[in-house]
Amino acid sequence: MSQVQVQVQNPSAALSGSQILSKNQSLLSQPLMSIPSTTSSLPSENAGRPIQNSALPSASLTPTSAAAESITPTVELNALCMKLGKKPMYKPVDPYSRMQSTYNYNMRGGAYPPRYFYPFPVPPLLYQVELSVGGQQFNGKGKTRQAAKHDAAAKALRTLQSEPLPERPEGRRPGEQVNGRESEEENLNKSEISQVFEIALKRNLPVNFEVARESGPPHMKSFVTRVSVGEFVGEGEGKSKKISKKNAAIAVLEELKKLPPLPTFERVKPRIKKKTKSIVRLQGSTDCSQGMNPISRLAQIQQAKKEKEPEYLLLTERGLPRRREFVMQVKVGNHTAEGTGTNKKVAKRNAAENMLEILGFKVPQAQPTKPALKSEEKTPIKKPGDGRKVTFFEPGSGDENGTSNKEDEFRLPYLSHQQLPAGILPMVPEVAQAVGVSQGHHTKDFTRVAPNPAKATVTAMIARELLYGGTSPTAETILKNNISSGHVPHGPLTRPSEQLDYLSRVQGFQVEYKDFPKNNKNEFVSLINCSSQPPLISHGIGKDVESCHDMAALNILKLLSELDQPSTEMPRTGNGPMSV
C-alpha cells in the first residue's frame, strides 16, 4: 500500500491508494476557474519566478502594456531625435577588467592545499557605451553592449524630453532655402559630394575631382583626391578613391559654407498669351466615301458583295537605298492592279485606287488632311437664287475693268486696320436698316446722293485742324457767319467725341452711337454711325463707354480728314456706308 502526502490549503494528511484515486477524480470534476484558487498558495520560494501556463493567456498582461514594453529606449530616442533634428551617436568604451587575486599563482606549495583553495570572487563583466546627442554626452552600463545602449538612451530620454520642439516656419516647402541656405536637417540626408555640386550649381562654379597621387603597396593603397570648386581647392586622403573623394568634398564644403547667402528673387510666372486661330477648316463633303481610305473602301465593297477580300502582294523593290520605289499588286477576283510608291503604304493605297477605277467606282480627289491657312485671294461669292454680287476689295487695288454700272451690284465695306469684334456684323443692307442708316432695302431702287466736293474739302480741313490742335479757325468762321449753327467753344477740345460733335454741328450731319454689352474680354463695344457724305461707320473698344466713344470718333475724324485727298480706290457703285 503506497502513501502520498498532499498539501492544499489544509495541513498535510496521509492518504491511501483508494483515497488518492477518489481525490484525483474529484479534482478533475471541478471547473477550470477553480484552478487559480488552488495555485494561489504556492511556496514562497517560487514567488520570484512565476510559472505561467502557456495554454492560457496571462490576465495581468494587456496588449497595450505588451506593446509599450516592446519599444526599447533606443527606438524612442531615435524618434525624439528626428523631431529635434539631432543625430544620436553611440561610442563603445572598453569594459572593466576582471579583479582577480594573484595569490597562490607563483607558489608551488601554498599554505593551503589546492583542493581546499577557492579563487577570489570576480565581479560580473560590465559594458560601457558613450552616447552623444547634440553636444550632450550620456554614459550607459550593462551586462551586454545592447543593455548599455539602452541604459544610455534612457538617460538621454529623461533629459531631452524636457526640451521644446523647434518651430518650423509656415508655408516652407522641403528643399526651400532659409536666408539663402538650406536647413541642416535636410543636409543630413545628402552626401557631401552632392552638397558640393548643389552649391556649385547655384553659384555657377565649375567642379573638378581628380586623383592627385597614389602611394603604398598594392594591397594597401592610399589615394589623395583634389577637388576644385571655382577658387576653392581641397584635398582628401583615403584607402579608396571613393573615400578620398568624400574627404576632399568635406574639406572644400567647410569653405563653401562660409560664403554669404545668395539673394532670393521671386519668380514672376510668365503670362501665356493665347494665339488667335487663323486657320479655316475646309468643309467636308456630305458623301462619306469622299474622305475614306481607298483600301478601306475596297474592303467594304467586297464585304457588301459577300466576296473574298482583296489580296495584296509586294512584287518588287527598286531604286537606290534612299530612293526606294515599291510595287504593290492587289487582286480582287479575276482583276489585278498595281500601284507604286515611295513606301509600302503609299504603294498599297495607289493599287487600291487603281482597282477601284477598274471596278467602275469613282475615285475621289485627295482632300487635304490638315486645315488650310487663310488664302489672300479675293474671289467673288455667288449665292444661288440671288442676283447680287459680293466682291471683296482693298484700297489701292484698282481695277480698270471693274467699273460696272449695273444696279444689282453691292460692295461690302473693307476693314482697313482690324477686324470687327465679336457681336458686330458687316454693314450689309439688312444691318444698315436695323441700325438706322438712311438706306433703302436692297432692291434696284438705289437713291444715292452725289457728294459735294466743296463741302467735303471744308469738312476735311476742319477735321485736320481739330485733330492736330483741338481748335478750328475754319469752323469758327462758319459759326460766326451762321448764327443759328451754335456757339463757339471756349478753349481747345481734347476728347475726339467732343471734336466730332462740334464738326457735325458745323457741317450739319448727324452722329449716332450704338452701345453693346461687355464681350468675353470684359470690354465695352460701341458702334458709331455718321450721316456724312459718304456715310461712315466705325467701332470702338474700351473699358468704359466714354473710351469706346472716343476711339470710334477718332477713327471717323481720320476718315473725314482724308476726304479731299485723291484716292486710288475703285469707284463705289453702291450706296453702302464706308467702314473703318
Curated annotation (Swiss-Prot):
DRBM domain ranges (all copies): 72-162, 191-258, 293-361
Cellular localization per UniProt: Cytoplasm; Rough endoplasmic reticulum
Pfam families: dsrm (PF00035), Staufen_C (PF16482)
Residue positions where N-acetylserine is found in the record: S2
Bias type Basic and acidic residues, positions: 165-182, 373-391
Residue positions, PTM Omega-N-methylarginine: R115
Record field: compositional bias (Polar residues): 34-44
Post-translational modification Asymmetric dimethylarginine, affected residues: R108, R115
Keywords assigned by UniProt, alphabetized: Acetylation, Cytoplasm, Endoplasmic reticulum, Methylation, Phosphoprotein, Repeat, RNA-binding
Record's keyword annotation contains Repeat: yes
Cellular component per GO, a single term: plasma membrane
Modified residues annotated as Phosphoserine in this record: S183, S285, S397
Cross-referenced PROSITE patterns: DS_RBD
GO biological process: anterograde dendritic transport of messenger ribonucleoprotein complex; germ cell development; intracellular mRNA localization; protein localization to synapse
One GO MF term attached to the UniProt entry: double-stranded RNA binding
Main location: cytoplasm
Reported function: Binds double-stranded RNA (regardless of the sequence) and tubulin. May play a role in specific positioning of mRNAs at given sites in the cell by cross-linking cytoskeletal and RNA components, and in stimulating their translation at the site.
Subunit text: Binds tubulin. Binds with low affinity single-stranded RNA or DNA homopolymers. Interacts with CASC3 in an RNA-dependent manner. Identified in a mRNP complex, at least composed of DHX9, DDX3X, ELAVL1, HNRNPU, IGF2BP1, ILF3, PABPC1, PCBP2, PTBP2, STAU1, STAU2, SYNCRIP and YBX1. Interacts with the influenza virus nonstructural protein NS1.
Domain remark in the UniProt entry: One of the DRDB could be involved in RER binding.
The name this protein goes by in its record: Double-stranded RNA-binding protein Staufen homolog 1
UniProt organism field: Ailuropoda melanoleuca
